[in-house]
A protein has these predicted regions:
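Intrinsically disordered, low-complexity terminal tails and inter-domain linkers enriched
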Residues: 5, 309-346
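Active-site and donor-binding regions of nucleotide-sugar-utilizing enzymes
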Residues: 13-141
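A donor-sugar binding/catalytic signature common to diverse glycosyltransferases
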Residues: 28-31, 248-296
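Short, charged/polar "capping" segments at the starts of alpha-helices
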Residues: 49-55, 124-126, 203-207, 227-233
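A nucleotide-sugar donor-handling region in carbohydrate enzymes
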Residues: 119-203
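C-terminal amphipathic helix plus adjacent low-complexity
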Residues: 159-160, 312, 316, 340-409
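Catalytic donor nucleotide-activated moiety binding site of glycosyltransferases and closely related
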Residues: 216-246
Length: 409
């Protein structure tokens, strides 16, 4: 993002924590990436700084961390209840459409900053038509909708400049992997498969564990403390183990995803981090009434299952610091597959596993669906690596945001 170095700006990013960890995680990642651009001054206003502190050790309200000033969004915050024109930043981002503090919003009329409504991520096609649209206000200000998504016609996804290079170095260093797993209390034997499980309380986890047990392969399922507390770690068939792990920082969660043969994730932030892991995963969308979440799942699947087709930007250079997503990772390939072949096509098996995990009433039972998808692990791995590779060719969300703002000036 160095092309913007000659344009120092002040940024205020507002975040109300609704989905617990995910909202804080996304806003922090964006704030940190903006702050890495020389000359940028970034404040992150967050109503629950303690949630962010769980993800980023050392974060405290009233202090700067990695170039970002963390401010507690409280009713008594002076800069929010009596802001002057100079208190308003040049660039104002409302995380996930949150309502800005009334007095700050009123002061924006004098400063007239660029105002961005950062929406939730979606892979659905309709976001391409809504991304970047203006919303003029009665006081003369304009709010712009910014939709993160997949492909070149959206706001993109968050990715640190050197993330994929760091992942490659980690995967190529067996001591780094074993040392990390050892810190979690895990010493996998040769041939041991590892799955991470981060899910909402309604996740059909018994079907997942049954599917893993039916493969006949040794699996260890890593579940964070406080997630799916009803899982009993001691009563499973031979070859299957469930192990609790401590809550991890953002950086360590990335390493966990890089270590696993299968990642089950939930929400927006962990979905994108699993994308950059380039490994087979199943995403649990936030459950909604009348299965309103299923189109979101289907939209991601369309991108995943079409990832090996030539992308629109074929031939574009990867972003700085990126590397190709490896399709031949430790633990992937034929050795991950169960002994039998799925009767369904590989792509159909992968789709059905995702839909079953997300409670699609028309999907097969969870255990059968995931079992069949694991039988298609070679294809699953290739698709996962290809989708990672396709998105890595494109500018990141932070890069697109800076370019979008420049185009409006």
């Amino acid at each position: 993002m160095s092309s913007h170095a000659a344009r120092p700006q002040r940024w205020d990013l507002f975040c109300r924590v609704i989905d617990n960890l995910g909202d804080a995680a996304v806003c922090w990642r964006l704030a940190r990436q903006l702050a890495q651009d020389p000359g940028q001054s970034v404040r992150l206003w967050i109503d629950q700084p303690d949630v962010l502190a769980r993800l980023v050790p050392g974060v405290r309200a009233g202090r700067s961390q990695q170039g970002v000033r963390i401010e507690a969004w409280r009713p008594d915050a002076l800069a929010l209840i009596r802001p002057s024109r100079n208190d308003v930043a040049d660039r104002v981002i409302a995380g996930f459409g949150c309502e800005l503090p009334p007095a700050y919003r009123a002061a924006m009329r004098q400063r007239r900053p660029v105002w961005i409504n950062l929406e939730y991520f979606s892979a659905e096609g309709w976001t391409r038509g809504s991304h970047g649209l203006p919303s003029p206000k009665s006081d003369g200000l304009t709010e712009y909708f910014f939709f993160p998504g997949l492909g070149a016609e959206t706001g993109g996804v968050l990715c640190e400049p050197n993330l994929l290079a760091e992942r490659a170095a980690f995967e190529q260093d067996p001591w780094a992997r074993s040392g990390f797993l050892d810190r979690l209390g895990l010493s996998p034997k040769p041939g041991q498969r590892i799955a991470s499980l981060f899910a909402y309380p309604n996740a059909p986890w018994p079907g997942l564990l049954e599917a893993l047990a039916r493969t006949g392969l040794p699996w260890t399922v890593l579940v964070p403390q406080g997630v799916l507390t009803e899982i009993n770690s001691s009563a499973w068939p031979a070859g299957l183990a469930v192990q609790r792990i401590p809550f991890l920082s953002q950086d360590d969660y990335d390493r966990l995803l890089w270590c696993c043969d299968l990642n089950l994730v939930r929400g927006e932030d962990s979905l994108i981090r699993a994308l950059w892991a380039g490994r087979p995963m199943i995403w649990q969308a936030y459950p909604q009434a009348e299965q309103a979440h299923l189109p979101k799942v289907a939209a991601w699947l369309d991108h995943l299952l079409g990832a090996l087709e030539p992308p629109p930007g074929k031939g574009a250079a990867p972003r700085q610091g990126s590397v190709a997503c490896n399709s031949d990772m430790p633990g992937s390939g034929p050795g991950l597959s169960p002994a039998h072949s799925s009767p369904a096509s590989p792509d159909a098996a992968i789709r059905q596993a995702w839909l079953a995990w997300n409670a699609d009433p028309n999907a097969p039972p969870v255990a059968s669906a995931i079992h069949d998808a694991l039988a298609a692990s070679v294809r699953w791995q290739a698709l996962s690596a290809a989708l990672c590779r396709n998105e890595a060719r494109l500018p990141s969300l932070a890069q697109r945001l800076l370019a979008f703002i420049d185009s409006r000036l």
